[in-house]
Design a protein with these regions (language model features):
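Short beta-strand-plus-loop segments that form exposed binding edges in beta-rich domains
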Residues: 129-136
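A short beta-strand element within beta-rich, extracytoplasmic domains
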Residues: 48-75, 128
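Short, surface-exposed beta-strand/strand-loop-strand elements in extracellular ectodomains
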Residues: 78-89
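Extracellular beta-rich ligand/substrate-recognition surface
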Residues: 33-50, 135
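Short glycine/proline/serine/threonine-rich loop/turn segments at secondary-structure transition edges
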Residues: 61-62, 116-125
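Enriched but not universal
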Residues: 1-11, 17-19, 148-158
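Edge beta-strands of jelly-roll/beta-sandwich modules across compartments, strongly enriched
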Residues: 136-145
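Extracellular carbohydrate recognition and processing domains
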Residues: 92-119
């Protein structure tokens, strides 16, 4: 059975992000990325990052199969996102230049290297961040961190 974790806080301010859809907040729960509700999402057209802390998960006891996932939609041609993983304020993984399609929500994922996963020493202090490379509008319906046999979720919408 996968381990499912919801966000417990926003790191910094979420004021630059609009909440779209009934009852949408940065920290509410959502469906799994495999069956998302794209009617509720957050959006930003300033190139601002959003960083959210995940509920402390159990250690997955392995350094393979750890993936950052995002379901988002862009509004510009050539728009890219960066997906980042932090332990506290220390960067663990930074994957920029992920091209996204304009106009419709799609799933994007990046597997974290074994070396990056091995550098995690405190699974109770993990944050996920997404940011657009441009000031084109970025809509995000789900962020999650998935372990091969456990899923650690951070949802940004409902």
């Amino acid at each position: 059975m996968p381990q499912i974790k919801a966000p417990i806080s926003v790191s910094g301010s979420d004021a630059a992000w609009s909440k779209n859809g009934a009852g949408t907040t940065i920290l509410c729960t959502s469906d799994h990325i495999a069956s998302p509700d794209d009617g509720t999402y957050i959006s930003n057209s300033g190139g601002d990052a959003i960083r959210v802390k995940i509920d402390p998960p159990d250690h997955p006891n392995k350094t393979t199969g750890l993936k950052m996932k995002c379901r988002c939609s862009g509004s510009g041609i050539g728009q890219e996102i960066a997906l980042r993983l932090f332990q506290g304020s220390t960067g663990i993984a930074d994957y920029g230049s992920i091209s996204i399609a304009p106009g419709s929500f799609e799933d994007y994922e990046q597997e974290i290297s074994e070396g990056e996963a091995a550098s995690i020493t405190d699974y109770s202090d993990l944050y996920l961040e997404v940011q657009s490379s441009t000031t084109d509008q970025l809509d995000v319906s789900v962020l999650e961190l998935e372990a091969a046999d456990r899923i650690l979720r951070v949802y940004v919408t409902t």
